[in-house]
């Protein structure tokens, strides 16, 4: 396939192969190419918005169908280069953290440096490399920060298929990877989607602590622990607080139970290595952080975006779910009066602690968490 730019003939098939090789050299584990036609995804997106499954993420409704129209983000766009990069660290310690209610569980994608800047920088370099090769090119990189349907694009580009938890799954890598896109104005040959591999499996749906996967491929964000601990700005609904357990930032349960994640690959990026203060952290220590400490520890981290107040809110809920101890109650009492939002969650947590003390309750793991820990420890999922 030949194409001319400024009278310079280009072999687009060869260029596509070059782009994939350049992407690998830049640290991406896979590179695919697709067109911009996402019309098939528009009805499901509209239905999801109509049901208010986006919760308080008003920007999703505000952008509406623009998410399914990449060419509106960069006029002249003909193709989308979709990439993925592994983020699973070598010492993820899923099971040991989840089963110890005195520790805080942080979704493993957030243990290291914020991925947005890293991936965007690599995508920009890829765009510049293509631009240099072609002599002229319009491009724009995206990393989970603009109104674009990155998962349908990744699926069309052959990076994997959409699992019933709505994440992209890959036969050789599971789902522990980030996605990114580079919009360009070249008519490159496109890749083909891969065959779906979930079959009748519904493990992700049944393991979800809050029942957020309301039907295959559909997540009600309002019930999702990741939404509740990251996106939700106000009070966490009381019904969900006991189900959150010790998860203080995000949740990985639907990924951890997935059989395909036995093939998950470790990251090569040092920036994604866990920060010491966030790896198997003690809840009481986390709750003692001042705002200055929080900002220092989370500098350059995705966690920083929720702010100190919501961080304390999340940790307060986890302390309410922890085994009874005088130390927990003392810690909770010590932060009363700092903010009405925090006070609400502190009062709830103290009530939970007192109930456990009065009933002499020893911490009992919820059945779903017990099952998940057993699955991880048996090695069905890599407990890196």
UniProtKB/Swiss-Prot annotation:
Q: Which parts of the sequence belong to the 4Fe-4S ferredoxin-type domain? A: 186-218
* A biological process term (GO) from this entry: tRNA modification
Chain sites annotated for binding [4Fe-4S] cluster 1: 198, 201, 204, 258
What cellular component terms from Gene Ontology apply here?
Answer: cytoplasm
Q: Does the keyword Iron-sulfur apply?
A: yes
Q: Which GO terms describe its molecular function?
A: 4 iron, 4 sulfur cluster binding; epoxyqueuosine reductase activity; metal ion binding
Q: Which domain of life is it from?
A: Bacteria
Q: What does the record's cofactor remark say about binding?
A: Binds 2 [4Fe-4S] clusters per monomer.
This protein's cofactor list reads: cob(II)alamin; [4Fe-4S] cluster
Query: Where would you find this protein in the cell?
Result: Cytoplasm
Active-site residues (renumbered): 144 (proton donor)
The UniProt annotation places [4Fe-4S] cluster 2 binding at 208, 224, 251, 254
Q: What EC number(s) has UniProt assigned to this enzyme? A: 1.17.99.6
Q: Does the keyword Transport apply?
A: no
Which reactions is this enzyme annotated as catalysing? epoxyqueuosine(34) in tRNA + AH2 = queuosine(34) in tRNA + A + H2O
Keyword terms of this UniProt record = 4Fe-4S, Cytoplasm, Iron, Iron-sulfur, Metal-binding, Oxidoreductase, Queuosine biosynthesis, tRNA processing
Q: Cross-referenced PROSITE patterns, in alphabetical order?
A: 4FE4S_FER_1, 4FE4S_FER_2
- Where does this protein act, in terms of pathway? tRNA modification; tRNA-queuosine biosynthesis
**Pfam families documented for this protein:** Fer4_16, QueG_DUF1730
> Tell me, what does this protein do in biology?
Catalyzes the conversion of epoxyqueuosine (oQ) to queuosine (Q), which is a hypermodified base found in the wobble positions of tRNA(Asp), tRNA(Asn), tRNA(His) and tRNA(Tyr).
* Family named by the database record: Belongs to the QueG family.
Summary of subunit composition and partner proteins:
Monomer.
- The protein depicted here goes by the name Epoxyqueuosine reductase
């Amino acid at each position: 396939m030949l194409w001319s730019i400024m009278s310079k003939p280009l072999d687009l098939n060869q260029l596509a192969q070059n782009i994939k090789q350049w992407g690998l050299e830049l640290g991406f584990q896979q590179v695919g190419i697709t067109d911009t036609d996402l019309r098939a995804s528009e009805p499901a997106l509209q239905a999801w918005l109509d049901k208010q499954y986006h919760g308080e993420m008003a920007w999703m409704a505000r952008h509406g169908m623009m998410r399914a129209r990449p060419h509106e983000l960069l006029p002249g766009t003909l193709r989308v280069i979709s990439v993925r990069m592994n983020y699973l660290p070598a010492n993820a310690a899923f099971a040991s953290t989840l089963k110890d209610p005195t520790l805080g569980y942080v979704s493993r994608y957030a243990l290291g440096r914020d991925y947005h800047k890293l991936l965007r920088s690599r995508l920009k370099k890829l765009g510049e490399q293509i631009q240099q090769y072609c002599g002229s090119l319009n491009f724009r990189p995206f990393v989970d920060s603009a109104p674009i349907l990155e998962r349908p694009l990744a699926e069309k580009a052959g990076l994997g298929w959409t699992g019933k938890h709505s994440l992209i799954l890959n036969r050789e890598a599971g789902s522990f990877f980030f996605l990114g896109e580079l919009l360009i104005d070249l008519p490159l040959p496109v890749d083909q989607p891969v065959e779906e591999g979930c079959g009748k499996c519904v493990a992700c749906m049944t393991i979800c602590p809050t029942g957020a996967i309301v039907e295959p491929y559909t997540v009600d964000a309002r019930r999702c622990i990741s939404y509740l601990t990251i996106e939700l700005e106000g009070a966490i609904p009381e019904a969900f607080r006991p189900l959150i357990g010790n998860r203080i930032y995000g949740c990985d349960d639907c990924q951890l139970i997935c059989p395909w994640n036995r093939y998950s690959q470790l990251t090569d990026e040092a920036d994604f290595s866990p920060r010491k203060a966030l790896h198997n952290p003690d809840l009481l220590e986390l709750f003692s952080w001042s705002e200055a400490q929080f900002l220092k520890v989370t500098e350059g981290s995705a966690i920083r975006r929720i702010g100190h107040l919501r961080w304390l809110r999340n940790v307060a809920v986890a302390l309410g779910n922890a085994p009874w101890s005088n130390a927990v109650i003392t810690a909770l009492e010590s932060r009363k009066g700092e903010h009405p939002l925090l006070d609400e969650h502190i009062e709830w947590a103290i009530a939970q602690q007192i109930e456990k003390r009065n009933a002499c309750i020893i911490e009992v793991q919820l059945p779903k968490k017990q099952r998940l820990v057993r699955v991880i420890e048996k090695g069905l999922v890599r407990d890196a």
